[in-house]
Amino acid sequence: MAQYIIRPTRKTPTSFAIIIDSTSYVKAKDAVMAYKNSVENDGLGTYIAVATWRNPEAIKSLLKQWHSNKQQPLEGAVFVGDIPIPMIRDAQYLTSAFKMNQKSDWKASSVPSDRYYDDFGLTFKSLKQDAEKQLYFYYSLSPKSKTYLSPDIYTGRIKPLEIAGKDKYELLKRYLYKVARLKNAEQNNVLDHLTMARGHGYNSEDRGAWAGEQLALREQLPSLFGQKATVKFLDFDTFYPAKLVYLNEAMDPQLDVLLFHHHGAPDTQYLNGNQAVSGVEASIKNIKRYLHAKVAERAKKVGADSAVSYYAKQLNVPESWCREAFDPTIQRRDSLFAADQDIYTSDLHQLKTNARFVLFDACFNGSFHADDNIAGSYLFNDGNTIATIGGTVNALQDKWPDEFIGLLATGMRVGNLNRFNGYLESHVIGDPTFHFTDNVHPGFSVNLALSLHHRDAKFWMQQLNHPLPDVQAMALRQLWLSGYRETQQLLTKKYNTSKDFVVRMEALKLLSL
């Protein structure tokens, strides 16, 4: 199909674009139009661009063209279906943690990133298209490019799962119809139910970090701590195993936001390890489970008897404990125990997750490029989850995942949250236009401010004393981006005088850049 464009039917201050491949459009046309109409009814004129996209360059050209339209500038876009995936090389310093020798397999040593599309100031050299994964297009960040991220628009991915027994186009249709339905049914939904859940071995182990985050959230989202709202902080070692408690929380039909802090893989949320115990019997059980796994693995290489003998001597434990690794009954028991430790995509496929927005502060959970992935599994089920944010590669623990999260209560679209606190690997998976109704400071349109007054020093100077700390913090970011000549003095003053944690933290962060 030749490129086909449907233009916005509403004149709005800014616009949005749905970029979709030809097959997905034909298979899900009515659902796509329902989604477009729901976005337009929400005050955002919407383009649809349909094509058999041969490379990312054509898409980026369209986005830049629409963004430069002064009458209705583009504020964001979503990539629906099989849209080319930029695989970025020579830019590892723009990730939070990813470091890999680029001599390794290019699929593993490149970063899947839509910063290629949404950050117009980054410049790239095209390298090649992957011979096996036809959607993968490799780019090298030019040495002449700017060296920091400052996306001009927000973007998101709606790429249905490709799993056995499911038609990906049917999954796409059902998701788009769901979003259209909920945008209409919940147009007055405010952010008044939030849950944070932590997994083991992460910065979750630091009680100081845990306490500090709660203090910051109270400052960013004060209405959550009032009489008519609910906020929960769940800990991996309070509920053991935590899996069922966390899944129950994810299925809560009232839940607005679910924040996860844990380790992750494309198909796994890691929640628990062996339980910290002090009793003798419980400690022996932990040791035995450890031995069963180690002995079974070593036996594949050296045989059962040799593996049993090795670990019995190495760890000074009875051989009988080691030999249990080959008992089918114990193998099944250990397997069930291990399955209860973590959340897998196979669990989510059977459930209805309802948290409207889920943030994964975890490695790999946002791997939209994988056929099956955690973020997509929260979206493509019969629940009410609309949007997620996650990373396509590993993630640093010592970062600020909640930066600007207080602006969600003012109606900020989740796409803008990722635009201003994301890394090279960070992506919205789902509808990036999703937002809550502003019940905090009606009259201040944060989305229009971030689009029409981006880097507008005069406008943001007027927001420095805004009653909401996160608006003040955003004002500091915008002034820094604008090149305001007295930025350093202003940041120093704010750090020394502000009563708000998040404002001081934003000032300190910007001073360090």
Model feature map: region roles:
Residues 1-513:
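Cysteine-dependent hydrolase recognition
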